[in-house]
Amino acid sequence: MDISMNLVILEELYGAERAARLIKDAGFSACDLFIDLDKSESRWHSPDYKKIAADLRATIESQGIKIKQTHAPFRFSANRWDEPDHFKLFVKTLEISSILGAKVCVVHPLHHMEYMGHEEGIYALNVEYYKRLVPYCDQFGIKVGVENMWQRHKIRGTISFDTCSTVPEFVRYIDSVDSEYVVACLDTGHVMLPDNRDKPADFIRALGHDRLKSLHVHDNDYKSDAHWQPYHGKLDWAEIAKALGEIDYEGDFTYEIHDNLIRNLPEALIGDALKYYGAIAKYIVSQIDDNRPK
């Protein structure tokens, strides 16, 4: 199992080559990249985007790091989901991800609308949405990771349930699309933000080996989507590791920690901080391996 982390802020601060070298020196073997096609100034809008992707992959791989996972853009309103030009951005994201060498591209479900009371309509939209992506997954040889979400209550402003934020719905989404190219990406930190009786380990066991192929690993205090490193919040990492081992999880251990855990540090401390984050990941992976079927 590769241990991986989101590289965006490190690349922004230090460039791709040094960013990859920093995480390699910290014990990581892979990284995750955000494909920011939702920004007008994104490099991926260049006519040379294929060469840019190939060159970026070569640069990162030269430091011993693989790009195993990407994240599709998600800052858009629900009423844009079926616009042809908008859908093309997601197809292009899959193409870029494939050139980069990624195995999974995480694509948020459509959830930019009020969820409670509209669950079935949102479900129908999302099943259609993911099924439309399947032929392109096949073309580019990449899987789409469906992520469990949360949202703010329209009136109270408190965190509430959203798409795939319960075990039965998450399982239903994956099974309804029914494609080897559409898998689950469990965001550990999102699970307990709503008043959820199911914990991350329950999601892991329910999704099981065949559905769960990707992770967004981070911690929080159940009050905000803090994206802390493990053991700095309230999640039960021993139970998470146990469950991942029990299902013989074969994906990567991929951090999605907050940019400020990197951005706010003096440059002199970056290397040591990354080694600390790497040590946490290695420890949890060792616990996963200890719980695999014998």
Model-identified regions with their sequence ranges:
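Histidine-acidic metal/acid-base catalytic patches
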Residues: M1-S4, I9-S29, E61, F87, ...
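Glycine-rich, proline-tolerant flexible connector loops at the mouths of alpha/beta enzymes
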Residues: D32-R57
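Metal-dependent catalytic neighborhoods of phosphoester/phosphodiester hydrolases
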Residues: S42-K50, N79-P84, M116, N264-L265
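Short glycine-enriched, charge-decorated loop/helix-capping segments at active-site entrances
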Residues: R43-P47, P84, I159-S160, H227-Y231
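Active-site acidic/histidine proton-transfer and metal-coordination neighborhood
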Residues: D55, T59-S62, A78-L186, L193-P194
